[in-house]
């Protein structure tokens, strides 16, 4: 019992215990306030246990320097007051940094549904816009006050502990007892850092790793088991390789066949193919105008035509009956900048930290927009096109583009994202009316209203906010009434855009392409097939409508990807083109049989990749390990059905890995001279 009277032992154990209690409390806050999981979720308690072991590891790492300073034989926290003040300063800084990471992590998860990782660094590139969006969306002052108060409270508690232990009279402890306590302490610290005590291989002890939290196969449950500070560190320390040329060569024959490469060359890794003017081009005296309308943060789960029961999108629903309506359209990766990239370049942005738009070496991409010869080209955005450096991609890739952004508009700015979508459409109409009638144009309109802070502008042409309850909207996928009304506003503005186009005289000879850039955070989507929520497909599954007065309405059930847009529209418009990117004209037969679309299901340093068809999803780790096949029509979609469908499993396994590795190469190979 004499050993338990040790001042240093009591201080070390007590300090680690206090910090561990803080981290455990923050984990409870995450589970209750942010995870969105009911407390009876399968595997939740086991995952919490993993998370608490990560918390103990972090607590030990934070306090280890002070424990060492207390344990030194002569100059230590007991004998040197200056050293004690230095230790207190360290505690203030360390706890403040940890607290800040947790705050950012909570916001990051609430916004994107992903724990903080190295990809968060991309927001630092647009710090001013990110800061303004946070300021307009969250109670920053209250959050800051709570953060500082929590840091002050825990530092005060640790200082009190210090006085209650280190300032006590020195007990008499024998040398052997002291040595035994020291040895036990070292072993305990090592076990805490290791994170496990069962099933240890003493010759090769494997520590608890972030991947252990994903044992359930459910990313939402796994998020409960991660420690944001440790996970951020894990993702930052891994080098970001650009591409694996060996893997590209290994899968080249299958991918060249998939793309329909005219002259396959495994040595040069040639992906180029050419398409002539097709007989199915739309008839007209001159080539049609093309209008791309990117629908900010709009997933299929929010659209009535895809099953949303609250009728939030009557205009898009009506258009769906008058257009090519795509039931299974996917963006390859979530994130607006990544969607802009793929929609222009035709190459999925599979970078693992920053967005491809932020790499100055690759922003000058080949794009099929340049195949629309004789067209005036416009890109219109209500805010600042410097956001995520997309202006570099637009200006360097699209020849002769006229880029209009926040500084060019006369309309008032409504929030951090610039002018309203309706004002963007109205001012854009004036620009498009000015194009000579005998000259076609290509216009890319990027909307932003369906985004936090979900501003409803005062000048909105009669839009009315719906009087619905939080329970109603949460039962249909929205997380708040504000989010639901933002979707309604976006749809209302699309209806106004079509009226504006008809009044402006540029509707009749135009192809309109409406597509979502990614889904936003959802609550629950019982109106969708279970696979979309349980397999994480709801993030990538977005609406797509292709509308033209001369285009016969059609429902397309096959899986189609974002990279397919430009080749498909070029075929409709009668444009011959040369393509070395990933997309394909969907009116051409798919060489692989049932169409396959490559996906990134979970971003970050260790992404999970997938290949999706109309009926199946194959998912695997980024290195090809742990492949599983899932039936999208099943009521239990997490079940691996690879044994029931061995041929499809084999086909998709090669295509999924090959398409992902080829896309990584194409980011660099598609650069223009």
Where are these regions (language model features)?
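Transmembrane and membrane-interface helices of multi-pass
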Residues: 1-242
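Short coil/turn linker and secondary-structure boundary residues
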Residues: 39, 125-126, 227, 241-243, ...
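Residues that form generic nucleotide/phosphate-binding pockets
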Residues: 51, 55, 133, 156, ...
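Short alpha-helical "patches" and their helix-cap loops
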Residues: 81-82, 243-253, 356-360, 583-584
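The feature marks either
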Residues: 218, 225, 233-276
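Generic detector of well-ordered alpha-helical segments enriched in charged/polar residues
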Residues: 46-49, 69, 84-87, 131, ...
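Solvent-exposed soluble domains appended to multi-pass membrane proteins
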Residues: 262-673
């Amino acid at each position: 019992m004499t050993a338990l009277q040790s001042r240093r032992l009591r201080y070390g154990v007590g300090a680690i215990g206090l910090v561990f209690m803080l981290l455990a409390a923050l984990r409870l806050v995450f589970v209750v306030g942010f995870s969105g999981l009911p407390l009876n979720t399968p595997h939740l308690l086991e995952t919490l246990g993993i998370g608490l072991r990560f918390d103990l590891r972090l607590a030990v790492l934070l306090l280890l320097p002070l424990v060492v300073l207390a344990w030194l034989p002569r100059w230590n926290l007991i004998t040197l007051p200056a050293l004690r003040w230095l230790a207190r300063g360290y505690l203030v800084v360390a706890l403040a940094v940890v607290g800040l990471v947790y705050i950012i992590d909570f916001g990051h998860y609430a916004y994107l549904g992903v724990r903080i990782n190295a990809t968060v660094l991309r927001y630092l590139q647009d710090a001013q816009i990110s800061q303004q969006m946070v300021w307009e969306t969250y109670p920053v002052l209250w959050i800051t006050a709570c953060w500082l108060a929590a840091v002050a409270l825990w530092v005060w508690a640790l200082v009190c502990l210090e006085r209650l232990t280190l300032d006590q009279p020195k007990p008499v402890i024998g040398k052997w007892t002291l040595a035994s306590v020291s040895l036990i302490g070292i072993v305990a610290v090592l076990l805490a850092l290791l994170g496990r005590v069962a099933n240890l291989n003493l010759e090769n002890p494997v520590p608890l790793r972030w991947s252990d939290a994903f044992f359930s196969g459910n990313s939402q449950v796994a998020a409960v088991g991660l420690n944001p500070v440790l996970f951020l560190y894990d993702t930052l320390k891994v080098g970001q390789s650009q591409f694996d040329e060996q893997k590209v060569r290994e899968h080249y024959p299958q991918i060249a066949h998939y793309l329909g490469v005219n002259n396959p060359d495994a040595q040069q890794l040639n992906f180029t193919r050419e398409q002539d003017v097709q007989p199915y081009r739309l008839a007209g005296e001159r080539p049609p105008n093309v209008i791309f309308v990117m629908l900010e943060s709009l997933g299929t789960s929010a659209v009535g035509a895809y099953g949303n029961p609250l009728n939030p999108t009557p205009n898009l629903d009506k258009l769906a009956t008058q257009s090519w309506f795509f039931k299974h359209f996917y963006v390859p990766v979530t994130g607006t900048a990544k969607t802009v990239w793929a929609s222009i370049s035709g190459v999925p942005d599979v970078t693992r930290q920053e967005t491809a738009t932020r790499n100055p070496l690759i922003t000058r991409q080949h794009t099929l927009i340049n195949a629309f010869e004789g067209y005036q080209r416009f890109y219109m955005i209500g805010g600042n096109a410097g956001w995520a450096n997309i202006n570099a991609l637009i200006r360097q890739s699209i020849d002769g583009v006229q880029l209009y952004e926040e500084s060019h508009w006369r309309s008032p700015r409504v929030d951090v994202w610039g002018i309203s979508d309706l004002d963007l459409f109205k001012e854009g109409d004036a620009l498009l009316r000015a194009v000579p009638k005998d000259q076609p144009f290509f216009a890319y309109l990027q909307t932003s209203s369906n985004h936090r802070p979900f501003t409803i502008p005062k000048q909105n042409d009669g839009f009315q906010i719906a009087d619905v309850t939080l329970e109603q909207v949460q039962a249909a996928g929205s997380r708040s009434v504000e989010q639901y009304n933002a979707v309604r506003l976006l749809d209302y503005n699309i209806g106004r855009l079509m009226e504006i186009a008809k009044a402006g005289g540029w509707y009749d000879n135009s192809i309109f392409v409406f597509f979502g850039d990614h889904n936003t955070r959802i609550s629950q989507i019982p109106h969708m097939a279970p696979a979309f929520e349980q397999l994480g497909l709801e993030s990538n599954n977005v609406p797509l409508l292709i509308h033209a007065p001369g285009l016969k309405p059609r429902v397309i059930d096959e899986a189609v990807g974002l990279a397919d847009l430009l080749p498909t529209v070029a075929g409709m418009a009668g444009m011959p083109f040369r393509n070395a990117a990933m997309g394909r004209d969907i009116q051409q037969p798919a060489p692989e049989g049932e169409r396959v679309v490559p996906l990134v299901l979970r971003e970050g340093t260790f992404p999970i990749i997938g290949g999706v068809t109309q009926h199946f999803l194959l998912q695997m780790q980024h290195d090809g390990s742990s492949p599983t096949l899932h039936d999208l029509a099943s009521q239990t979609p997490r079940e691996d059905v690879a044994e029931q469908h061995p041929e499809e499993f084999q086909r998709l396994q090669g295509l999924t890995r090959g398409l992902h590795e080829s896309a990584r190469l194409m980011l660099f190979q598609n650069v223009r001279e």
